[in-house]
Amino acid sequence: MILIVAVIGIGGAAGVLRAADARTSDVERIDGLDAILADLPGDDAEYPAENYLLVGSDSREGIVAGSDDYAYVGDIDLVGGKRSDTIMILRQERNGGAALMSLPRDLWVEIAGTGESQRINSAYNDGPERLAATVSQSLGIPIHHYVEVDFLGFKDIVDRIGGVEVCTFKAARDVHSGLNLQPGCQKLNGDMALAYARSRYYEEWDDSDWTMDPRADLGRIERQQLFIREAVNGLLHDIESSPFSAGDTIQAVTESVRIDPRLDPIKAAQALRQAAQQGLHTYALPVYNDTVGDAAVLRLADDADSLLAYFRGEGPAPTQLETTTDPALVDASVDASGSG
């Protein structure tokens, strides 16, 4: 969804919109979510925003033994079950501005409709409906829309946009995800981008030995948000130089995502244009480490209240914000396209 915004909402040219409209009619819709999602706020609603639940699933569907993808993530027979590998909430305010909050997959919550507590990512075992209900009920945040992409979809999108540049001061690796980076800046293809985004056992070479990032999933969230910043900013530069070259990206996104039945990607992207012009802000949900039995989990920290209140529509945006898109570049792109 964020990449659709970058291509459509920021590009803005009429040709881009026509191409996008033709593509988005083919996007796969997930039946059954209407009963779970919050009512859409009208023009006079007290809640001045819409929240998108963005999900990266760890589904291996379509990956077969012996393929190039198998070496990185395995196939559906090797890795049983299906969980949400990445969970984010994108808040789009009616008067402009947007914020992205990442939820750690090990967050310990009550799973909606079960009366039992588990890690939040396990809710996806019972489908998108259960996950959306669990996120909404456990955090008190209304969810208005749902967007999902799986491993193969993520890889395809990155390859179609020509890769994403990531910089690291030291050599980095993750023997579990397949990540292997040299010091400096390099453009990641789909395979390596997936290894980077999935990395929970991230190590850096420190003079004479490999040092593990002790933050595990919290470190992964930080890297994912960095990746989103670079992907969006890279797309902005590409669109600025060639607004009509967005067709391949639009096709990749629409072929790779599943969305709720009532979401109109074009209208959503256009509504988010003003937000992109002001800059996208990213947050990590404050949590602390705990154990349940022998399992390591994360629980909500006390200082999460102000952030959750903002996403619930009950308080102002937290004061510590990080701008992830360059507003000046967005303005230049819109002006060049003749839209605004």
Where are the regions that the model predicts?
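Second-shell loop/turn segments in exported
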Residues: 75-79, 117-125, 140-145, 183, ...
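Entry/capping segment at the start of metal-dependent catalytic domains
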Residues: 1-95
